């Protein structure tokens, strides 16, 4: 059974088929409605320079042909026109059908719409009109033409023209863009293009190479002098690959780490532009059509004032000091007419403007300055802010228009003209009420919802900053400051970490309040995902900034009303007669219908007692005995009960009356004055973790304890608001469903006839076999009792079930009571006034829904947590690199972060030996343990830092952060750092903040205490001193707490300080040698601490949105995956591409969800391609050129975009970005782009170093894959080096006998084999074989494969040995024959005198022989050559060829070649002579070497 459970066995496939049918119908509809092209006629500009001449002279610039899609509107067409080079300059215009005179003298009427609008020829088309509706009157085949017609200006269109001009001359991501005002520095930066182009090396330092350049000597008549100079040159593929300088693992330097790309250099097109100070136009000039005055400083040095009238723009006679609205005459004295387009006018008055603008998109014919995905603004996602950055230089660029942007967008000159802020609530709820019956309606609705949620999040962050600084007064100034509420930009803002009203005093006070708001936001996000019709939720966002948590919500209509809602009472009286039909309100959508509700009479208290008359459902938190109930709201809540697995249960009010609820009674329903029903306080949509309440609030610690720590076991958990995660509820539900299905199947099998008993037994045996096979996945050396038990449970749960025996799946029923074990304050008996008792009202576990809550808590401890560790142990979990990735993984598995201590304890249990002896974790478990412990420290430190920052002013916060970091991370360098604090000085009694007194010892004690309290774990103090990965913890603190550090190398220890000092000394010495003036600037002051206040540049708000994922695209994406899993690959990929288009349409491309779906598609293509490669390789006669049939190039394009988007929205050094880079590197290698693949692998190693550091097992995988890529490039030496490093890393992580070590050795065998080192390959293969035999058994496929490798390598080496023996035998035989020949010749050769002349073979003269020369027969010479040549020495073979040539040179041969009497002293010398190394011959070795090299080819030819 799949993880989606057999619950989908009957209806899941039907739903998928229904979705597929819906998509097919939509596709058929689109094919039927494929629109013919539409030609847009564009007017001509007044200036000839406005539109550049195209490279292709046949391309017209007065018209553009577009191919609209169905449902595209006139507004969509205008957006396309605005980006075209021939129409970028247009001012306000409308699209019209060509004029045809009608009967009434106006344009001819072509059609009338239901909304009474008309489509007339020659009149402006409604921008929301669909394009196809504009041409309903045309027959098929007729030309479709629209005309862009200039429209008169208003103030709005004048301001829009200026904004359009700014977008043109100051594109996003360029140096010209100086008007942006982000929340942090270098928002949304990316380095992907640098990595792609090889501009980022391992340490991000610029690579230099020496080249010769000609420098002028200054002398007349003489050429320049060539001198070696250093020139910056990027490492690119035409010189060397990314690993060419790889020497091994080297930690990345923070000081030179690549964190962002420099903005594209763009020359300014105008000196300045600003709204003229003569604005607004006076009444008499406004009456003449004046709309706006604009002051522009041209590059030519002239400052002009442009006046916008209803007819267009013109240059006035005004100057900076005097206003004259008269048009400035032309050079010939004539008065020019206004120019309709502002951009066209600037072209006509400034040639330099035309020149500069022609280099910018969309006018430039050379393409974009940079990849748009790296530079365009991020519309619907929070940009990532790098944790390291450099302040801009200069700190701020002068830009007057930056202060006038508010006017450009609002048109308000004063507070009386400011438009009311956006009504966020009405926008959100209005979009919710849009129709969603068809796929197109759903897409449009979700697109609008995602857009408004993103804009709400950004507005909330801005509002929180204003509130936190004290710029916004509270709306309840008389109350406790912790209870202050604020209203800014129509956003209701409250503090989320103070329980000022003691609402959660019984659950933990402020700590419980903070958790409650986090759970509330999660509940709102979950309900937004469910999107139940008729249930409304406020816009909701959490913003954490400078130690405080702020809750931002849209305003509930009527929440600030102080009078009784007389209208509601009247409406209630009118609908009392219709109370019996109130249930029908469930499916209605009109607001008027929401009035038809039952009279909420079932309350414990009267309406006069209620402080909130809007509340109609749920438990009143201010009056615990008051319960509100409303039938219509209850009916609506039943729609969310099924997806959330909620059980119907009853709650008693103060009068003992019972009311039925689905969600917790603490989830409140309020009826706004707009008639809508809203849900608030959604924190209790999941049940309570009763196991934690009973065992871990004050229970014993699960971590290792010292002998003297028995008293510490009672450390109190900070709060009692502990709940299970919805993911765990779903997992437990699926697990119970499988167990129920197995029980039903077993009962059905038991009832079968005896004839089927044998078949049933065989099926059981097969199941047991699978169970044993799955258990064997764990290496035997790691089969601790805990691991074996977890594996057995996993195998039992995955045991297949015969679905035909189950019957109706609806018989299974499991739901949870969210009010079970919920603690509430209860007043005690009389006589004990003021005293309350905290107890739960629902605890009867005989109720299945209550017992299910208990069982779910046990499932979390006994099944879910061990399953997490088991998957890590067996290698089924990857990508857990840091605390953030760990938290995300645990949440997906339903494990709360408070269980980190239990998770660490489980790791220790899984690491014990088979006999139960304690053993240090290794491999993946060791890495997981390191991440878990560091995450405990991080979260404890975050809570402490938050408390320190809470009361501080912004200017003091940076000093507090730097001192905190010194105490946490810099104590090895300076054990007693002194805090920097400068009082504001306004109040003489100003108290000293708490951070000033913080010391490293105090901080370590607080962290240990926090870890004990929050995670039930005893943290060893030595871990804080030597176990922390400090650079990685610094990155996480900056990224997740929200602050940016100055980019520099931070020194954490004395040893590192010494290394930095040596490096600086080397730099200074080099500068002195070069005569650099750097030393004249003075010595830099030596730091005494790791961090200083100036290092903390800014604190960035952390936004937690409640916007859910896109459900309509998610459904199609999941359908695509399921289709691929069923073997229909082509249809599945089509589904995934359809989902990608929807994600792009809804999220506007640059969004983390779009990056995720890009990666999913590329990963699917990669897996399919690998599978097809295996299938081709398994064929009898495989064709390596056979196409795979998948679009790898398209997948590469998506994956590259995914990386860039992830860097901009998640972070350059984020765990998901690293995963995308790995997938990209693998795809590049699959496509054959080895150079690119190596660049990404090299950068991936840098990412791992920054995120985790060295020593993680997954780093070995990267090194191994890079080595395989190098093998394809024939760089076998470096490939072998990387394979060895991968093996050494694996050996260090897992030990010598681990299965992973065997796998690494198996990879290393191939490296040795390709390098030609057969002996090492054989030895490595034998080591791998021993590991596989011990861990997998001799019958395992991998063991058999390795045994074959050993057998083949042994055969190769034996063959080499036999060849060597044969060569030795031939050489020995030749030596014997030579000896016999010498004996036959006589004793002349026995002379011991050294020759004085030059030895040579052959005769001198025409057959005449010198005196005393003896003859050697040809057989002897051949034997001599064999003795030197059979050994495989190429020099000897060449010498034999030389001897043969010498004989031919003598002309006639005697037939008995002779050797002189003193020709040699011994056999060895003779052999050496033939090999060209005879002693006593001057320069013979050198000459022989060169001569043999040259005659080697001649001999080969002969």
Swiss-Prot record:
Cellular component terms per the entry's GO annotation: cytoplasm
User: What are the Acidic residues biased-composition ranges?
Assistant: 575-586
Q: Where is the Clu domain?
A: 399-693
Molecular-function annotations in GO: mRNA binding
Which PANTHER family does the annotation name?
Answer: CLUSTERED MITOCHONDRIA PROTEIN HOMOLOG, EUKARYOTIC TRANSLATION INITIATION FACTOR 3 SUBUNIT EIF-3
- Here the segments flagged for biased composition (Basic residues) are 1486-1502
Query: Where, subcellularly, is it found?
Result: Cytoplasm
Region Disordered: what ranges?
1-62, 571-615, 755-799, 1054-1085, 1381-1403, 1429-1502
What are its GO biological-process terms? intracellular distribution of mitochondria; mitochondrion organization
Provide the alphabetized UniProt keywords. Cytoplasm
The record's Gene3D superfamilies line, in alphabetical order, gives: Hypothetical protein (hspc210), Tetratricopeptide repeat domain
Q: What does this protein do?
A: mRNA-binding protein involved in proper cytoplasmic distribution of mitochondria.
Renumbered to this chain, the signal peptide range is none
* Origin organism lineage: Eukaryota, Fungi, Dikarya, Basidiomycota, Agaricomycotina
Q: Which family does it belong to?
A: Belongs to the CLU family.
What PROSITE patterns does its record include? CLU
Summarize subunit and interaction data from the UniProt record for this chain: May associate with the eukaryotic translation initiation factor 3 (eIF-3) complex.
Spell out the InterPro entries in the cross-references: CLU-central, CLU_dom, CLU_prot, GSKIP_dom_sf, TPR-like_helical_dom_sf
- Protein name, as recorded: Clustered mitochondria protein homolog
Bias-annotated ranges (Low complexity): 7-35, 781-792, 1429-1451
Comp. bias intervals (Basic and acidic residues):
53-62, 587-606, 1054-1069, 1462-1471
Is Cytoplasm one of the keywords? yes
């Amino acid at each position: 059974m799949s993880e989606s459970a057999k619950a989908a066995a009957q209806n899941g496939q039907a739903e998928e088929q229904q979705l597929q049918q819906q998509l097919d119908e939509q596709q058929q509809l689109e094919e039927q409605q494929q629109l013919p092209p539409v030609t847009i006629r564009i007017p001509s500009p007044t200036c000839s320079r406005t539109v550049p001449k195209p490279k292709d002279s046949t391309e017209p610039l007065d018209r553009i042909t577009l191919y609209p899609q169905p449902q595209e509107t006139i507004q969509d067409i205008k957006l396309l026109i605005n980006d075209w080079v021939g129409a970028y300059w247009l001012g306000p215009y409308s699209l019209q059908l060509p004029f045809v005179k009608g009967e009434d003298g106006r344009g001819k009427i072509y059609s009338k719409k239901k909304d009474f609008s008309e489509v007339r020829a020659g009149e402006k088309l409604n921008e929301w009109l669909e394009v196809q509706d504009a041409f309903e009157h045309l027959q098929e085949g007729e030309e479709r033409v629209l005309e862009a017609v200039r429209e008169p200006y208003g103030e709005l269109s004048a301001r829009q023209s200026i904004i359009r001009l700014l977008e043109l001359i100051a594109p996003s991501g360029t140096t010209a863009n100086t008007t942006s005002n982000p929340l942090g520095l270098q928002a949304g930066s990316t380095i992907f293009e640098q990595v792609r182009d090889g501009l980022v090396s391992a340490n991000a330092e610029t690579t230099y190479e020496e080249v010769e350049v000609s420098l002028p000597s200054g002398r007349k008549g003489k050429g320049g002098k060539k001198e070696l100079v250093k020139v910056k040159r990027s490492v690119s593929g035409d010189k060397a690959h990314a690993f060419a300088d790889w020497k091994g693992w080297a930690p990345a330097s923070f000081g030179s780490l690549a964190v962002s790309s420099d903005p594209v250099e763009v020359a300014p097109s105008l000196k300045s532009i600003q709204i003229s100070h003569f604005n607004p136009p006076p009444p008499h000039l406004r009456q003449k059509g004046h709309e706006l005055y604009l002051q522009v400083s041209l590059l030519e040095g002239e400052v002009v004032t442009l006046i916008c009238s209803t007819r267009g723009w013109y240059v006035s006679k005004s100057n900076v000091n005097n206003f004259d609205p008269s048009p400035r005459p032309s050079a010939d004295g004539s008065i020019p007419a206004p120019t309709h387009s502002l951009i066209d006018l600037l072209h006509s008055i400034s040639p330099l403007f035309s020149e500069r603008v022609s280099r910018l998109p969309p006018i430039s014919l050379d393409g974009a300055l940079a990849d748009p995905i790296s530079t365009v603004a991020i519309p619907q996602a929070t940009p990532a802010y790098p944790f390291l950055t450099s302040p801009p230089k200069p700190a701020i660029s002068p830009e007057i228009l930056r202060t006038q942007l508010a006017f450009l967008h609002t048109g308000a000159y004063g507070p009386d003209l400011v438009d009311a802020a956006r009504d966020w609530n009405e926008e959100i709820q209005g979009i919710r009420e849009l129709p969603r019956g068809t796929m197109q309606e759903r897409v449009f609705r979700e697109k609008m919802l995602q857009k408004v949620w993103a804009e709400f999040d950004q507005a909330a962050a801005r509002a929180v900053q204003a509130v936190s600084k004290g710029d916004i007064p509270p709306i309840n100034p008389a109350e406790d400051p912790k209870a202050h509420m604020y209203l800014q930009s129509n956003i209701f803002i409250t503090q989320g970490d103070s329980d000022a009203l003691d609402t959660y005093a019984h659950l933990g006070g402020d700590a419980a309040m903070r958790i409650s708001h986090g759970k509330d936001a999660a509940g709102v996000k979950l309900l937004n995902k469910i999107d139940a019709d008729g249930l409304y939720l406020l816009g909701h966002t959490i913003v954490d900034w400078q130690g405080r948590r702020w809750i931002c919500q849209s305003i509930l209509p009527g929440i600030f009303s102080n009078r009784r809602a007389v209208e509601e009472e009247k409406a209630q009286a009118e609908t009392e007669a219709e109370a019996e039909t109130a249930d029908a309100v469930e499916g209605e959508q009109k607001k008027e219908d929401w009035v038809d509700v039952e009279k909420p009479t079932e309350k414990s208290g009267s309406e006069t007692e209620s402080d909130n008359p809007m509340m109609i459902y749920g438990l009143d938190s201010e009056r615990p005995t008051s319960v509100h109930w409303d039938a219509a709201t209850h009916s609506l809540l039943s729609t969310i009960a099924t997806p959330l697995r909620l059980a119907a249960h009853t709650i008693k009010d103060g009068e003992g009356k019972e009311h039925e609820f689905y969600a917790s009674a603490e989830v409140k329903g309020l009826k706004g004055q707009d008639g809508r029903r809203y849900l608030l306080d959604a924190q209790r949509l999941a049940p309570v973790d009763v196991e934690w309440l009973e065992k871990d609030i004050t229970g014993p610690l699960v971590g290792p304890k010292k002998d003297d720590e028995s008293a510490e076991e009672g450390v109190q958990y900070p709060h009692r608001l502990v709940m299970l995660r919805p993911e765990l509820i779903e997992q437990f539900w699926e697990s119970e469903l499988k167990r129920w299905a197995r029980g039903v199947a077993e009962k059905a099998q038991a009832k079968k006839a005896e004839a089927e008993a044998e078949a049933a037994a065989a099926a059981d045996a097969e199941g047991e076999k699978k169970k044993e096979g799955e258990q064997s996945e764990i290496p035997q050396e790691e089969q601790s009792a805990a691991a074996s038990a977890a594996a057995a449970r996993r195998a039992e749960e995955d045991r297949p079930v015969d679905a035909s025996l189950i019957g109706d799946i609806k018989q299974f029923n499991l739901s949870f009571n969210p009010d079970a074990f919920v603690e509430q304050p209860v007043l005690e008996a009389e006589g004990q006034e003021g005293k309350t008792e905290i107890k739960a009202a629902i605890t009867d576990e005989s109720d299945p829904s209550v017992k299910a809550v208990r069982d779910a808590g046990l499932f979390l401890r006994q099944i879910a947590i061990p399953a997490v560790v088991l998957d890590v142990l067996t290698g089924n979990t990857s990508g857990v690199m840091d605390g953030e990735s760990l938290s995300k993984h645990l949440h997906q598995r339903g494990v709360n972060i408070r269980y980190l201590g239990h998770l660490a304890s489980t790791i220790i249990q899984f690491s014990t030996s088979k006999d139960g002896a304690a053993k240090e974790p290794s491999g993946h478990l060791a890495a997981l343990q390191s991440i878990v412990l560091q995450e405990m420290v991080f979260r404890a430190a975050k809570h402490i830092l938050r408390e320190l920052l809470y009361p501080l002013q912004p200017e003091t916060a940076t000093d507090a952060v730097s001192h905190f970091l010194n105490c946490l991370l810099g104590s090895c360098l300076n054990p007693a750092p002194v805090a920097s604090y400068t009082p504001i000085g306004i109040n003489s009694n100003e108290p000293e903040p708490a951070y000033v007194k913080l010391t490293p010892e105090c901080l370590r004690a607080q962290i240990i205490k926090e870890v004990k309290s929050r995670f039930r774990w005893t943290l060893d103090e030595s871990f804080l001193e030597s176990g922390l990965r400090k650079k990685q913890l610094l990155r996480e603190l900056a990224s997740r707490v929200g602050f940016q550090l100055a980019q520099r190398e931070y020194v954490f220890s004395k040893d590192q300080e010494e290394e930095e000092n040596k490096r600086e000394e080397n730099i200074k010495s080099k500068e002195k040698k070069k005569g650099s003036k750097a030393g004249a600037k003075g010595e830099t002051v030596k730091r005494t601490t790791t961090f200083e206040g100036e290092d903390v540049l800014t604190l960035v708000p952390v936004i937690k949105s409640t916007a859910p994922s896109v459900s309509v695209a998610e459904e199609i994406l999941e359908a695509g995956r399921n289709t691929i899993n069923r073997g229909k690959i082509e249809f599945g990929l089509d589904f995934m591409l359809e989902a990608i288009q929807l994600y792009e349409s809804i999220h506007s491309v640059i969004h983390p969800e779009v990056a995720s779906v890009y990666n999913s598609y590329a990963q699917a293509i990669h897996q399919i391609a690998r599978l097809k490669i295996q299938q081709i390789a398994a064929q009898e006669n495989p064709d390596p050129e056979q196409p795979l049939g998948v679009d790898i190039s398209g997948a590469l394009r998506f994956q590259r975009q995914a990386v860039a988007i992830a860097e901009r929205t998640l972070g350059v050094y984020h765990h998901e970005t690293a995963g995308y880079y790995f997938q990209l590197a693998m795809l590049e290698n699959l496509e054959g782009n080895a150079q690119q693949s190596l660049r990404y692998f090299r950068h991936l190693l840098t990412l791992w170093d920054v995120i985790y550091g060295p020593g993680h097992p997954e780093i070995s995988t990267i090194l191994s894959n890079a080595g395989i890529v190098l093998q394809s490039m024939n760089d076998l030496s470096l490939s072998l080096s990387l394979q060895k490093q991968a093996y050494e890393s694996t050996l260090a992580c897992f030990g010598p006998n681990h299965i992973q070590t065997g796998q690494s050795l198996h990879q290393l065998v191939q490296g040795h084999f390709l390098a030609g080192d057969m002996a090492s390959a054989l030895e490595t293969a034998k080591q791998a074989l021993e590991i596989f035999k011990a861990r997998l058994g001799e019958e395992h496929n991998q063991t058999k494969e390795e045994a074959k490798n050993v057998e083949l390598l042994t055969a190769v080496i034996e063959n080499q040995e036999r060849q060597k023996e044969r060569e030795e035998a031939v050489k020995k035989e030749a030596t014997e024959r030579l000896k016999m020949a010498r004996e036959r010749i006589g004793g002349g050769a026995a002379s011991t005198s050294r020759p004085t002349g030059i030895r040579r073979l052959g005769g001198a003269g025409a057959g005449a022989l010198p005196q005393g020369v003896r003859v050697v027969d040809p057989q002897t010479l051949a034997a001599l050559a064999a003795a030197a040549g059979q050994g495989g020495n190429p020099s000897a073979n060449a010498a034999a060829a030389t001897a043969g040539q010498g004989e031919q040179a003598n002309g006639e041969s005697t037939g008995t070649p002779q050797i002189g009497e003193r020709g040699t002293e011994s056999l060895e010398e003779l052999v050496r002579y033939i090999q060209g190394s005879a002693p006593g011959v001057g320069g013979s070795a050198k000459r022989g070497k060169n001569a043999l090299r040259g005659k080697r080819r001649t001999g080969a030819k002969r």
